[in-house]
Amino acid sequence: MSQKETFYITTPIYYPSGKLHIGNSYTTIACDAMARYKRLMGFDVFYLTGVDEHGQKIEKKAAELNVTPKEYVDKMAADVQKLWKTLDISYDKFIRTTDDYHMAAVQQIFDRLVEQGDIYLGEYEGWYSVSDEEFFTETQLAEVYRDDEGNVIGGKAPSGHEVELVKEESYFFRMSKYADRLVQYYEEHPEFIQPESRKNEMLNNFIKPGLEDLAVSRTTFSWGIPLKNDPKHVVYVWIDALSNYITALGYGSEDDSLFQKYWPANVQMVGKEIVRFHTIYWPIMLMALDLPLPKKVFGHGWLLMKDGKMSKSKGNVVYPEMLVERYGLDALRYYLLRAIPFGSDGVFTPEDFVSRLNYDLANDLGNLLNRTIAMINKYCDGKVPAYASKVTPFDSELSTTAANVIGKYHEAMEKMEFNTAIAEIWTLVSRANKYIDETAPWVLAKEEEKRNELESVMIHLAESLRIVAILLQPVMTETPGKIFEQLGLDPETMNMENIHFGEFPTDVTVTSKGTPIFPRLEIETEVTYIQKKMSQSESATEEDIKWNPEETTLVSTKEKQIKYDDFDKVELKVAEVIDCKKVKGADKLLQFRLDAGDENHRQILSGIAEFYPDPAALIGKKVVIVANLKPRKMRGQISQGMILSAESPEGKLQIVEAPKEMPNGAGIA
């Protein structure tokens, strides 16, 4: 193409409230594969990723760590960028919503929507989840808590996170104004939401029941972009975070040349849990701004474990670094894109991961390369013979297989069916391995009159590997180069455009001794290793508190009787466990973070660790605390109270739990 066609692809921007696991990395790797594919096809690609850094959750997290929100997000953003470097993510820009240019553009967008009447000032009352950064109506709650009179006093969001009743002044976006126009757009652009099932979900669950106007500002926290004309309000996540896809290109700035060049996005890739925000809120916002909508929003499935979603409390979190360090980057990228049909949920198991590395990479691909390099060295002095077709009875079948694979591969990649595209590559790998057995070059080498056939087998195998390596380039960032190197080829000349079987360069010498690119693994050993790493995932990510290694002795009273006046001084309260984890260097201590109805969370250390091997299982429970106990220093930390436990005759301790419906801070008489 004389002037390159543009291709703009985006990941969602990640919320940096914790360490990213392979489920988070899945989206980014898939986007990276698509970006690399399009570059290899000659497109002018712009690949955007980044982090969403504002909100109440970040503000609270920073306060708990005794740092400013900006200090906290600076550290987390650096960690995300470090991970993307580890995963060799070829993004063109990394946006942070704390970037000055983004904040200025968001203020401009908000003001415009107010001026044209799409945003108005009102008052909001609803159930809010800090973890989800989302409001819910009572009917949307997965679980509802009621008092004795039947009044709703709390509950849980569909995600399982606790909600709290929030009433505050807020600016609202007139979603309902654009509902009919959005439905019409869906009908006229059936490719807009992929897979198709996601579109039906949006229509039936959200649009047809009636779109409610959306709260787009908050006053109950300050860590956000302030409104220029009403600074007590900060812009809420919908306009702040979603706008990044255009502000990153310069929309709202003096230089919007990138926006003019790349917008609308070709693909916006998101997890299925945020499809609603990207296919309802986002397109309506763009309609209000008179901007074209992205061409496609693809909502992929989740990467699950056998026992459901990844969770530190379950000890089943897999972090990409631990797999890359032991098995290499390409092993992880290959597995994530091959094992899971993109768009559907997939299940990660250590057994499946290790088995695929063995069978697909070590056995199929690795052996094909090793055998080919060894035979070319042995039978042709390392020089790849010139290409000749139809010399053996099996040549045509192999070249036809390659041609079919190339066509089906491109078709699958354009649809983002990554697992299908990779499966097509392995069709050629398998056929080439079978070709070796069919032609038996070790037999041909014994007869001089079979020399032409032997050389034909060698070039057909080398050419098959060249095709395989070219097609693998979007998926694996290191392995194709290793294959090219062993084949004696220049990676810079191995383009994907107009690739055909039979174009292997002349006068090429392979490496004198091939190196295995994927060693075979001992399955049982590696499964045990991964499981151990998963079980350590909680302690490995304790980032909140640096514990003093000095031992602490807990003192308990032995008195049987006290005066009533003494007891009357004790203030017992209901508190909710917000976080709970073991104290490093102390086998007996657990560190609790509790909401006891105070302005800030309180910290209590308790010597019950041996009775709760999975501390995270206590999160969300309502416990009873001594709230007015004089703070004491333990392990270099302040313990602000005591958690009540019951002791069995055998000496086993169990936390005393309060009724779930009791509000945090309720007194106990």
Curated annotation (Swiss-Prot):
Source species: Enterococcus faecalis (strain ATCC 700802 / V583)
SUPFAM superfamilies in the cross-refs: Anticodon-binding domain of a subclass of class I aminoacyl-tRNA synthetases (SSF47323), Nucleic acid-binding proteins (SSF50249), Nucleotidylyl transferase (SSF52374)
EC number: 6.1.1.10
Record's keyword annotation contains Transcription: no
Start and end residues of each tRNA-binding domain: 566-669
InterPro entries registered for this protein in UniProt: aa-tRNA-synth_I_CS (IPR001412), Anticodon_Met (IPR041872), Met-tRNA-synth_bsu_C (IPR004495), Met-tRNA_synth (IPR014758), Met-tRNA_synth_2 (IPR023457), Methionyl/Leucyl_tRNA_Synth (IPR015413), MetRS_core (IPR033911), NA-bd_OB-fold (IPR012340)
Record-stated family: Belongs to the class-I aminoacyl-tRNA synthetase family. MetG type 2B subfamily.
Family annotation (HAMAP family): Met_tRNA_synth_type2 (MF_01228)
Coarse class of the protein's main subcellular location: cytoplasm
Catalysed transformations (reactions): tRNA(Met) + L-methionine + ATP = L-methionyl-tRNA(Met) + AMP + diphosphate
Keyword Nucleotide-binding: yes
Subcellular localization(s) per the UniProt record: Cytoplasm
Binding site for Zn(2+): 161
A Pfam family it matches: tRNA-synt_1g
NCBIfam families: metG, metG_C_term, PRK12267.1
Protein's UniProt name: Methionine--tRNA ligase
Key words of the record: Aminoacyl-tRNA synthetase, ATP-binding, Cytoplasm, Ligase, Metal-binding, Nucleotide-binding, Protein biosynthesis, RNA-binding, tRNA-binding, Zinc
Gene name per UniProt: metG
